[in-house]
Each structure stands twice: as structure tokens, then as C-alpha cells.
Amino acid sequence: VLRVSTQVLEHFRDVAEVLQLPHGRVRLEGAYLGGGFGGKEDVTVECLLGLLVWKTRRPVQLVFSREESFIGHGKRHPYVLRYKTGATRSGELVAMEAEVISDSGAYAALSPWVLLYSLVTATGPYRVPNVKVDAHTVYTNNPIASAYRTFGSIQTCVAYEGQMDALARAIGMDPLLLREKNFLRKGDSIATGQVLESEPMLGETMRRAWEALGPVRAGEGPVRIARGLGASLTPYGRMCWTRDSASAWVGMELDGTAVVRCAAPDVGGGQTSSLCSITAEILGLPLEQVTAVGRDSHFTPRAGTTTATRQLFMSGNAVLKAAGEVRRHLVDQAAEMLEASPADIELLDGRAMVRGAPDRALPFSALVRAATARGRPVQVLDKYDAPSAPTIDPATGQGKPFNDYTFGTQAVEVEVDEETGQTRVTRLAACYDIGQAINRQSAEGQVEGGAIQGLGHAILEEVVLEDGVSKNPHLLDYKIPTTLDAPPVVVVLLESGQGLGPFGAKGIGEPAMTPTPAAVMNAVSRAAGAPVVQFPLTAERVLAALKHPSPPSGERAG
């Protein structure tokens, strides 16, 4: 039995292969954790821990030091991106050409998959009729690079959003108007030729985010104030070349409460609470009467990885199906006992009642006990299959790589000290269409957390390497944002009901971070009067741009 902080319970199979044991001999329990962000998607300690336990025949605890973790675990891929964008003088995009190079480090790990995501998102949320993208991932002697929140989308977002601001300056057009003219709409195709089957609502997300920043402020003394924007499309659901699936079990206890069993690892994103909320909604139960059992490879149905913003989409739909069948059993039992038509039975607050006759009602406990006594326990195991498997033609790059996408926009306000180059983000607003909020507090927290994490990437975080060796493998010199660095964040959630998740929901875990660095880059570049495109946007890099400004044109005030 292994207990590991992981995003993938299926790693028990890797341990079994290493130990040359039948898969059923290895049990993996997922530990509670506050975040994974891709760093716990790879096999990390599982096989080492399994070997130690097998050889010593004793309990073993394996804990990495901060330095060991920095050195031994995957990082976000460093990218070099070269873009050229063509447009008419009226601002309609005509063509985009991109060269994308990622540093894989010493091993491939998930680098090919990350690069594929970059290819799919290379043109962002824009309508571009002619596209050419060449992408390469290369081996180097640098630390291994692997999965990290947004999985290749954040790097391309920086490139295409920087191009949109540069193009706006070149043709003398308001950058918001330029985006509005070229945003994808229902029926348009993305770079791979996939046709969007729902309305992205990009114009509204941009306007709402921009307005949420509030009144424009003027800088004082050496401080310049500017605003920037980042819009994005980010897929939710896994690109796995086979049809993705997830399973869940929902059952009623004799006291009328419900239990959900699903192996979806909860990595701090509210996966467990969302599955409980779905069950409660379908069955007509108070949320506190639904219990979740998960994180155990032996006792919960396979649900796949907590990666790719897929768990609400996949496991959420599996729970929705299973709970729907349980509801049908409860309704049929109630109809029989209350001598009514199933169409007239309502489920509310743990009771089944005849519509229009509230005195004709029974608690769920009575229904479950009666069904169980007849050998019909009220429990269902069900499976959800994604609508389609990813398809990409390797010769043309065309196809349908994902079932759906989440669209959104972030806007930021920055202060830049023209004497020191120091940058401070003072306001941040984000607007996304999430389809349907299953747990609004959790969704808002995802967006706030993703945005602050994105600020860290934009301004602070940098792995310093010398001959392939990390020179700052600790949190003393590798800076991450704290509460003192976090600006006020305004989150606006739109609910179009157009998603493929339960009740029309869309995933938000990774999209919450995608456009943040791009928005900060555009704001800082506007304040500096010249492009600042190397991340992080350190004081030295900003100061260099301040000393060599290029006159802006066609930009919105502020």
C-alpha cells in the first residue's frame, strides 16, 4: 500500500511493472494535497517508494528536500517563439506564421504532448484564415521539463497577444477594437480546422474584464501607469488518441443518505465537493447528506487523471449518469409505494412526494429499505465516454484535437517606476464563460489562484541555470508571489450553459492562468514605450526598454 501525493492514481500500474507484480497486488492511495499543477502528473516517488518497501519489508517514508524537489521534478518548458502576423489596414487578420521551440531538458517526458497543445492554441482565440506553424521540442542538458498548468497554452498566449498589441500599434487601431474584429465566433475554425460548435462569448469577456478594472488612474512622479489585456482559448479534456472515459458509483444508504465513489484525485481544486454537489442536485438531497469516497485505487472506480482540466467534464458526467439512474430507481420505488405515476413523483430534501399532494410523501430511507428488502439495493456504477477521440492528421496538422474549449480574458493595471524598472500589478480583472458554476466559490477561487500564479510567472519566477545546473533550487532565491504581492482580483463568471460538462459546465482550472502573463507583458510594454518580451519581466529588462522606447500609436488611453 502506497500513499502518495499524486494527480494520477493509475500510477499503481507503473509500480507493479517495476516490481514485476500483478497490478492488483499494488494499492495506491492519493494523499490530500492543496495543488498539483502538473508537477504530480509524472511518476515522482511512487516507484522509488515501492522498491524501498519491497526490499526492506518495512514501512518507508520518502520525503524530498526542497532542493531535491527542484532538481528532480519537472518544470515548465522554456520556449522560444517567433511570430509574424499579417492583416489588412482595416484590421482583419489574414495570416499568421509561427516557429515554436521548446526546451525538453534531458528527457522527453510529456514534451511532445505539451508541444501539441501549443500547436493547437498557436493562433489563440482569433480567426486566422492562413496559418503556418513549425514546432520542435529539443533535448538539452537542462533540468527535465514536463506538465505544468496550461500545458503549453500559456507560452503561445504570450506570443499571439503580443502580436495583437504590436499590430494595433502598427495600423493605428485601438487594441480592443482589433481583438473584437477578429475574435472567434460560433461556426469559425481554429488553426487545426476544428469548427466551434458553441459561441465563445469573447467580446463580452473582454468588455467585462476591461470595465471591471474601474476608472483609469494617472501616474505620479516617476511612476507610469498602464493597462494590458490578454485573451485566450484553453482546451479542457485530455488529448489521449483514444476516447477518454471515467467511471463513478453512486449508492443510497439505508438512512436515506448517498455515497459517491470515484477515483478522481482531489488536488485542491474542489473536485470532490463538485461531485457531491452534482449528486445532491440530481437526487434532491441536502449537500451534507452526500459523502464522497475517493483517492484509493482498490475501492473506487477508475476516473483517470486529474489533469488537462478534465475531472469536472469526465468524472462529473460519470457521476451525473450514475446519480440519474439512482434517481430513477428512487422514483420507481416511490411510485409503487405511493400508488402514483412515476411522472408525478418529485424528489426534494430527501423525500419523495406526489406532485400537488405534499401529504403523500415518503423519506428516502423508507424507499431504500423497501427496495433493499426486495433484493434491489439502490446503487449504480456507470461510465462516461467523451463525445469523440482526438483526431489530428500528422501530415497536415488538421483535425479535431479536443471536444471543447474554455474562453476568457484578463485585464491588468500596472505601475512601472521609470527610474528603477520595478513593476507592480495594482489591479487584475478576469472574465470567463464557465458554462455553469457547479460550485461558484470554488470556481472563483480557481480563477483568483490561477491569476496570482500567472503573476508569479510574469514578474518573479525564474529558474537560473549555469551549465545545466540550477543555481536557485530553493524558495529563498526562487521567488513566488505572496499575499503582499497579490493585487485586488475581480472575477466575473458568465454562465452560457454551452459546455460539455454536467449541466453545461466548462473546465476552468488551467484557463484561469493562461492569459495572465500576456496581459502583464502588454501593460508593461505600454508603460515602457517598447516591447518587453523576455520573462520574467525583471526590473533590469524593463529598465532596458525604458531607456530605448519606441513611440506607440493607436492605443487606448491608460
Predicted regions span which residues?
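Active-site cavity-forming subdomains of large catalytic enzyme subunits
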Residues: 66-131
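Catalytic phosphate/nucleotide-handling subdomain of diverse soluble enzymes
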Residues: 238-300, 315
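Conserved beta-alpha junction segments in alpha/beta enzyme cores
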Residues: 1-19, 109, 116, 230-254, ...
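Short loop/turn motifs at secondary-structure junctions and domain boundaries
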Residues: 75-79, 241-242, 404-408
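Active-site-proximal gating segment of KS-fold condensing enzymes and close homologs
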Residues: 7-29, 41-51, 128, 271, ...
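Generic structural signal for well-ordered beta-strand positions
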Residues: 94, 259, 423-426
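C-terminal catalytic domains of large/alpha subunits in multi-subunit enzymes
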Residues: 20-27, 54-60, 89, 114-234, ...
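Thiamine diphosphate
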Residues: 13, 36-57, 61-64, 271-279
